[in-house]
């Protein structure tokens, strides 16, 4: 519907000036009991500027930074798994409410929405890919052993900044404690690679991911045509939608 309205506007359709304000049957009277909209910000480009791209890992967004922290720690702990006493994960309220899960995970859908599972895979493998949610990976007893050692705590600053419109952080931090009393460094990641605040890092990786996925479907020549068009904004904006969509039709 939003795209349809944009196209109508570009063609000069002015719409109905009184659709909101008409007495009795206008939107304000029918739905808002006579009150008008009260918006936290002016209509602008905030939503598009703050799009989150899922780049690094196929993980639910509240866990992206936890997996990144886990991958960072992988090299330090991969040979000390049996020595781990506790894995402390500091996170935000939304992550605790939505993806913190204990107990049996029955299928990939359970696993890819479990903070502890995704973190465990990152610690064990130094990566997280889609296949890691399947039964053969989940059946590795080390996964649940690590999950059982995890302690989840809320960091109030993380919860606060998750909701702040100028930040919208998705923070997680991990620190691992060993039986001998030693510990790793606390690894904190506040913004995932796909966040607005990490565009400089994220965009090149996003372009690589786009090209990599194109190559699973199209010939080299078609991929080159699509990439050439999509990396030239001026040309792309002038390209009819039908021509663009034709490039995406299977060969």
Predicted regions and their residues:
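Terminal-appendage/accessory-domain detector
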Residues: 7-251
């Amino acid at each position: 519907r939003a795209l349809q309205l944009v196209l109508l506007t570009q063609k000069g359709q002015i719409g109905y000036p009184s659709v909101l304000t008409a007495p009795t049957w206008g939107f304000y009277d029918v739905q808002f009991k006579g009150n008008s909209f009260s918006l936290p910000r002016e209509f602008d480009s905030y939503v598009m500027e703050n799009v989150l791209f899922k780049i690094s890992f196929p993980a639910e967004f509240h866990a992206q930074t936890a997996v990144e922290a886990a991958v960072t720690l992988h090299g330090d702990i991969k040979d000390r798994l049996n020595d781990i006493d506790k894995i402390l994960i500091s996170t935000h309220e939304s992550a605790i409410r939505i993806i913190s899960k204990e107990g049996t995970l029955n299928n990939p859908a359970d696993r890819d929405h479990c903070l502890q599972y995704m973190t465990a895979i990152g610690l064990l493998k130094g990566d997280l890919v889609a296949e890691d949610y399947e039964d053969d990976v989940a059946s590795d007893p080390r996964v649940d052993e690590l999950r059982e050692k995890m302690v989840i705590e809320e960091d109030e600053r993380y919860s606060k900044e998750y909701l702040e419109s100028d930040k919208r952080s998705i923070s997680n931090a991990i620190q691992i404690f060993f039986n001998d009393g030693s510990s790793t460094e606390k690894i904190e990641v506040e913004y995932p690679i796909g966040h607005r605040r990490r565009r400089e890092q994220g965009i090149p990786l996003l372009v690589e991911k786009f090209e990599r996925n194109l190559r699973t479907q199209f010939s080299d020549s078609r991929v080159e045509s699509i990439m050439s068009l999509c990396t030239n904004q001026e040309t792309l904006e002038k390209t009819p939608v039908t021509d663009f969509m034709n490039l995406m039709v299977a060969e």
